[in-house]
A protein has these predicted regions:
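Extreme N-terminal basic, low-complexity initiation segments
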Residues: 1-9
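Short, positively charged and aromatic/hydrophobic N-terminal segments
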Residues: 9, 16, 38-43, 50
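Serine-esterase "nucleophile elbow" of acetyl-processing enzymes
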Residues: 41-108, 112, 226, 232
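Alpha-helical cap/lid subdomain in secreted, periplasmic
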Residues: 74-78, 94-253
Length: 253
């Protein structure tokens, strides 16, 4: 049994399952108003009453993020509340909508770690240009960062991971998307993203360079998505960045 502290203010209906406060929406945790985290009193039978507090961290992005998210959550399970949507973040405009929904229900998120790129640069027939040409891509990245900062959260941006050779593959998360890819596109979009992040004082987690260490770029057979080892390597670096930067930012406890 869990007795929720009167310090909490809930923004929507919620369930408490396995000692976890869960909203009835597609996000892992419900909003509370306690210093960028949540607090509850655990009075489980046979245990001493204890108070638990963890900062909330939000992971957003495409299928690359979805590949490492569960490992990041596992690595940080005793340090931070790691949350993420079950849905693919696709392109930057879609991620902007996702982050807005996240703060709508979880205004106390301390840090947002996100990536966008493959979908933005994708040219999928019958379209003849990228979903987000570079300038549009930069515009939506700025809006994502501005929204996070306006809500008091620290932001970490992850670069798009490299491509071994140009080609195409189906998205593996059920979106029915078909992604065309080229490492020349990746380098162009990464440079554009880094320009924005430098302008806005955002930390860049260079997953591109990490994956360049492997001769196959830590890619699975479709040459787009990460191998299991690639997801583990990225998860470890993401967790390190979260540990380092979740204690800073433009908010105070």
């Amino acid at each position: 049994m869990i007795n929720v502290s009167p310090l909490l203010t809930f923004a929507c209906a919620y369930d408490i399952i396995d000692h976890t406060i869960r909203p009835r929406i597609p996000w892992r945790y419900v909003a509370v108003t306690v210093a960028r985290g949540y607090r509850y009193v655990d009075k489980t039978a046979g245990q001493k009453e204890s108070e638990v507090f963890m900062k909330k961290v939000l992971l957003l992005g495409d299928s690359i993020r979805m590949g490492y998210q569960s490992e990041v959550k596992k690595l940080l399970e005793n340090e931070y509340e790691v949350m993420y949507p079950e849905d693919n973040g696709r392109f930057a405009a879609y991620t902007l909508w996702q982050v807005n929904q996240a703060f709508k229900w979880n205004p106390d998120i301390a840090l947002v770690h996100f990536n966008n790129g493959y979908w933005d640069m994708n040219i999928e027939s019958p379209m003849t240009e990228a979903i987000h040409p570079v300038k549009e891509y930069q515009s939506f990245l700025r809006r994502i960062v501005e929204l996070c900062h306006s809500c008091g959260a620290t932001v970490v941006f992850a670069t798009t991971v490299p491509i071994l050779e140009a080609g195409s593959a189906n998205d593996n998360t059920g979106t029915m998307g078909f992604i065309h890819y080229s490492n020349e596109w990746v380098k162009e979009y990464n440079a554009a993203a880094i320009e924005v992040m430098n302008e806005m004082g955002v930390v860049v987690n260079d997953l591109y360079t990490l994956c360049m260490e492997d001769e196959r770029r830590y890619k699975c057979a479709d040459l787009l998505h990460l191998s299991d080892e690639g997801s583990r390597r990225c998860a470890a670096q993401v967790a390190d960045y979260i540990r380092k930067y979740a204690e800073g930012g433009n908010f105070s406890l």
